[in-house]
Amino acid sequence: MALNLRKNHPLLKTINDALIDLPTPSNISTWWNFGSLLGICLVTQIVTGLLLAMHYTADTSLAFNSVAHMCRNVQFGWLIRNLHANGASFFFICIYLHIGRGIYYGSYLNKETWNIGVILLLTLMATAFVGYVLPWGQMSFWGATVITNLFSAIPYIGQTLVEWAWGGFSVDNPTLTRFFALHFLLPFVIAGLTLVHLTFLHETGSNNPLGIPADCDKIPFHPYYSTKDILGFALMLILLISLALFSPNMLGDPENFTPANPLATPPHIKPEWYFLFAYAILRSIPNKLGGVLALAASVLVLFLFPLLHKSKQRSMTFRPLSQILFWTLVANLLVLTWVGSQPVEHPFIIIGQLASISYFTIILVLFPLAAVLENKMLKL
């Protein structure tokens, strides 16, 4: 009998077990597409980023002009830059939907996969933040100043830590060069963590919309889900290319068309849209350390989901109370995102504070309470 190379070759069999013969639940919906879409985002960002890095100069006197030169004089430089800038937005859209899916269907009960996923989110946020500083526009500079300054709220070592991160007494050339180094490095860290994430996922297999074991009814990944993934790729890439070609600056900040000036502060300092929810939570507490702790908690709270799961059912598919809370949480995050983009004045201050309180209340109090109540109602 001929040797089946796909199943016996040391390297090919790993790929085969992950992408071809992987046993997959037969009923996973389009919400399960976002993992592979994140993979495509990562590859796109690394490729476009590498091409941009070939023309970028990490120096305060040259950075802004090097980006302008790229868009004007490099073949398709404008397109590569627009794809990279908007690709970051799609990366976050996909990861937020992916996390939302995980919460709704109880995927967080695969604890190792979930924890690596949260670490991936934190790494992605760090990568996006340091990358945003590189074009050295006004909002790049002041965003870097404001966010790095938050570390000075850490008692005793805070100020030393910030000056160590800056490489001086303010955001300047050393800061820019180290941010470029980090922005180059971190995507490869993300790629490595992704492999760990998949390794843990393939230990248990995928969850499914019913939240029940599906071992009795598995189908091979290829051709079924490989085809389904390609459809997802096409749809996302159409949206990304449309955004990059028709309105590339829609999600950016107009302040970044002005070179960084340490002597002029923009009227409203705000991060990119994908950080606005966390920024709103940070601003809702009128104390520096308290705000920083709330900011950290807004993302780190994801680590607690496996511990807060009190329901006898895994997924929310048949749990209407939890569903109502889930969609309230989604609406709440949209409100936080909107408030984060508004100036610090009445009524936005109180709206932000109420939305921040309800964010933590829903996750830490109401989700477990609803689960216990549903167990009682169903006599489980």
Curated annotation (Swiss-Prot):
One of its GO terms (biological process) is mitochondrial electron transport, ubiquinol to cytochrome c. The chain crosses the membrane at residues 34-54, 78-99, 114-134, 179-199, 227-247, 289-309, 321-341, 348-368. InterPro entries: Cyt_b/b6_C, Cyt_b/b6_C_sf, Cyt_b/b6_N, Cytb/b6-like_sf, Cytochrome_b, Cytochrome_b_C_euk/bac, Cytochrome_b_N_euk/bac, Di-haem_cyt_TM. GO terms for molecular function: metal ion binding; ubiquinol-cytochrome-c reductase activity. GO terms for cellular component: mitochondrial inner membrane; respiratory chain complex III. Its main location: mitochondrion. Heme 1 (or BL or b562) is low-potential and absorbs at about 562 nm, and heme 2 (or BH or b566) is high-potential and absorbs at about 566 nm. Belongs to the cytochrome b family. This is Cytochrome b. The gene is MT-CYB.
